């Protein structure tokens, strides 16, 4: 992406940013997810652009609509003063931030961080939510969504999101194009370094094959070259003794070391995994994110990517 080329935005004249005077408030950009927040903070470092997540301490995406709806009166001044929102709505219609912000401020710009408004720009790679693939999983749960939601867990997608956000930030704030461009390159290098380091460690640890009790991490496994031997997706309370026995047998027969999940499951499931000599690894989808002192961590996305990969590598080496 050539950041020197400032993209033409609809109604650009409305949003031209004057030079900051002594009493002028710095530009404000809003986000609603950890991924959007971390990427936007990284891209605007060293500029006067302020980035604020709504709310500051984060919310699960599924709860964000209710949170904003109940506080619309108190949030309206924030929406009115903001120049842009970094949203994921085109990929995840459940992201409500831009809709509420626009209700308060018709001039606010929607920076789409996943599926861009431009008809010529590619978006992030999206995958379908996995379903159970094992022979014994005939009564497994159906996925809640067709498109798997946590696409920021792919380093490739995180980089693409950075590209998309940076391009629109440059269009909105051309005076800071050089700094944003430098920040983008720094962000890309750090993410590529992280992926390269862990790909080597995963190969060395023998953790190139995993079994999944959730479909939430399809982007992570695809991006890191991890082969998912099988999926079995079923609420804990619905597991039968036959399910537990079948899981243990499958893990043992296929010498699988690592089983990934999105939460700590029931004791019975944990015992079924350990009986096969495998390790259960609970991963973080980044929703709502990393909260430190009642605020999302600026580098929360990077922390989550590293934490997840560390957990898989450590489990495989035990």
Feature names for model-found ranges:
Residues 1-5:
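Positively charged n-region of N-terminal signal peptides that target proteins for export
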Residues 21-318:
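Extracytoplasmic metal-acquisition and chelation regions
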Residues 6-17:
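Bacterial N-terminal signal peptides
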